[in-house]
A protein has these predicted regions:
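Boundary/linker segments flanking structured domains
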Residues: 1-58, 62-142
């Protein structure tokens, strides 16, 4: 399994990021005694319903501390809890995972710029920047 972005001839981080090559971790990874990732990262939360050929990208985020980002409060955690509860009520299976790309700029401004480019490219429904487009019932802005 790859644990960071896959490198190519291009220096463009958007072109290097291959989400499906990144190692999927359970959303509870932050409870592990040792984190598999440290430092700056872009992270992606995906669901892989068994009836779909491709996973669903739900959220794109960035952090300076991959090993600590999800330990505290995080809006996306509550969105994912609501999403999971709804799927269970409807008897629909899900396979949620989080994937980290640690081959990103350490400088917060540049990393956030990359995060915003990815959000605009992929339009994940749980990011606040795309809520008007998707009007998902799982986020705080109803």
């Amino acid at each position: 399994h790859k644990t960071s972005c896959e490198h190519s001839a291009s220096d463009d981080p958007l072109r290097r990021l291959k989400p499906l090559v990144l190692r999927p971790l359970p959303l509870s990874f932050w409870r592990w005694p040792e984190s598999p990732h440290r430092g700056a990262a872009i992270y992606l939360v995906l669901d892989r319903p068994p009836h779909l050929d491709q996973p669903l990208l739900l959220y794109v985020g960035e952090t300076l501390a991959a090993d600590r980002r999800w330990k505290g409060d995080h809006d996306c955690k509550s969105y994912l809890a609501a999403y999971g509860e709804t799927l269970q009520r409807c008897q629909l299976p899900s396979q949620l995972s989080i994937r980290f790309c640690c081959d990103v700029p350490r400088a917060t401004r540049h990393r956030r710029g990359l995060e915003q480019e990815l959000i605009q490219r992929w339009l994940p429904p749980f990011n606040k920047e795309t809520r008007q487009r998707w009007a998902t019932p799982f986020t705080a802005d109803r």
